[in-house]
Design a protein with these regions (language model features):
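Accessible peptide chain termini
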Residues: 1-2, 23
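Short hydrophobic transmembrane-like helices used for membrane targeting/insertion
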Residues: 2-3, 7, 12
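Short, Lys/Arg-enriched N-terminal segments with co-localized hydrophobic residues
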Residues: 10-22
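Surface-exposed, interaction-prone regions used to assemble/regulate multi-protein complexes
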Residues: 23-216
Length: 216
């Protein structure tokens, strides 16, 4: 598995390169600009959501767009090259920003690929929950890293909840579920980080943070 291979490499490097004793602390939470945009749509009418049609599964690649009060906001999942837990790695990172109509088109150009799909909502956004995961990585010498990141968001309207999340640190697919309790479709955090090399392990936690309770 990918995690096992890279973490095993990190463990060997940590033994051979004794001069580098830094613990990596990687923070990929939402930026203030993302939080401000999320706050803005609470109390507003969510007219519709635009995403890829569910062709290969219930996900949209890289982007989901939200039409709110004649404005458009977008949940993006883009790769960033990071000095990650076990070395240089491309890691997918969420953002939530205002965008233009031209930015809402699917990333695909193949005619056989999924087409954009617009789902009508026409409900008031009552609350937004940010899902943050924290991974504390250990080897035989102790903790060597911590990775805190946005796993997804839940948008609560008058009648439903809409949940958007990613399933791996490296992929750019945004999974989508809706209903009364859509987060039951999300994978457990421990199942996503359970493939460490011998001598390595992680302590994992997931937090659900209401947008109204975030203090600047």
């Amino acid at each position: 598995m990918i995690i096992a291979e890279f973490v095993h490499t990190a463990f060997i490097l940590s033994k051979n390169q004794k001069e580098d004793k830094r613990m990596k602390n990687i923070n990929k939470k939402f930026a203030k600009e993302d939080i401000d945009c999320l706050r803005f749509i609470v109390g507003k009418k969510l007219s519709s959501i635009k995403h890829d049609e569910f062709f290969w599964g219930n996900f949209s690649t890289s982007k989901v767009s939200f039409y709110v009060d004649s404005q458009i906001f977008q949940l993006r999942l883009k790769e960033e090259s990071l000095d990650f837990l076990w070395g240089e790695e491309d890691v997918s990172v969420f953002s939530f920003q205002k965008c233009e109509e031209k930015d809402t088109n699917t990333i695909y150009i193949d005619e056989k690929a999924p087409k954009p799909l617009i789902t009508k909502i026409d409900e008031i956004v009552k609350n937004i929950i940010i899902i943050e995961d924290t991974i504390k990585a250990f080897n035989q010498e102790g903790q060597f890293g911590q990775f805190t990141y946005v796993f997804g968001i839940i948008i609560k309207t008058e009648n439903k909840e809409y949940c958007f999340w990613k399933e791996n640190y490296f992929e750019d697919d945004i999974y989508i579920a809706k209903g009364q309790n859509p987060k039951e479709n999300m994978p457990d955090i421990d199942s996503l980080w359970n493939d460490w090399a011998p001598g390595c392990y992680s302590e994992n936690s997931r937090n659900y943070i209401e947008i109204s309770k975030i203090v600047e």
